[in-house]
Regions:
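Short beta-strand element of the alpha/beta-hydrolase
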Residues: 56-65
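N-terminal carbohydrate-binding/catalytic regions of secreted carbohydrate-active enzymes
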Residues: 43-47, 70-75
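Primarily recognizes the serine-hydrolase "nucleophile elbow" in alpha/beta-hydrolase
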Residues: 112-172
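Short amphipathic alpha-helix adjacent to the substrate-entry channel of hydrolases
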Residues: 73-91
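Stable alpha-helical elements in mature extracytoplasmic
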Residues: 8-11, 75, 79, 106-113, ...
Length: 172
């Protein structure tokens, strides 16, 4: 198998290539007006790793962040590349964290990201059925909470995830 560094490099090289070929790979989740109202929203962003075939299922990767910073480029890129190799379109979410963001900010960002992908499914070439959430550490906790109808997907009015993959989720 490949080393972690080789997998990360392959993922970053792929993103650079699709960007060079004209595909947008970064998407802010909030408008300038929404960011002006809540400046912490500027941190929320999606990184897009397109599938090779249209109509692919999609996954959202939620990296861990030690509750202080987001690790989407470490865990997110390598996981995105591995899922891409399995036929998925993958989005790595940089979600808001920290005291200034507030307790529900990561859930709000995840719901916004899911809605954004669903609303733009044709642009991204993805199926809207049975999306996956894959989270590491605090991202795993976020995915797990979001899998609960009362606190997650149902509260935010988005479809229920088809699968949750929780890698060492933390518990506060």
């Amino acid at each position: 198998g490949k080393t972690f560094a080789e997998v990360c490099a392959a993922g970053l090289n792929y993103l650079a290539q699709v960007y060079h070929d004209g595909t947008r790979v970064t998407y802010p989740l909030y408008s300038e007006e929404e960011i002006a109202a809540v400046p912490a929203r500027a941190h929320a962003e999606l990184y897009y790793c397109p599938a090779q075939q249209p109509g692919a299922r999609f996954a959202i990767v939620l990296s861990g962040n030690a509750l202080y910073y987001s690790g989407e480029l470490r865990g997110g890129v390598s996981t995105a590349w591995e899922l891409h190799e399995q036929g998925y379109a993958v989005f790595s979410l940089r979600y808001r964290i920290g005291w200034e963001a507030g307790d529900d900010a990561p859930l709000e960002d995840l719901a916004r990201a899911i809605r954004f992908v669903m609303d733009n499914a044709d642009t991204f070439g993805v199926s809207t059925e049975d999306y996956a959430l894959l989270g590491y550490s605090s991202g795993g906790q976020l995915a797990g909470v979001f899998g609960n109808e009362e606190k997650g997907w149902g509260r935010y009015g988005v479809p229920k995830p088809g699968v949750l993959l929780l890698a060492y989720p933390i518990n506060n």
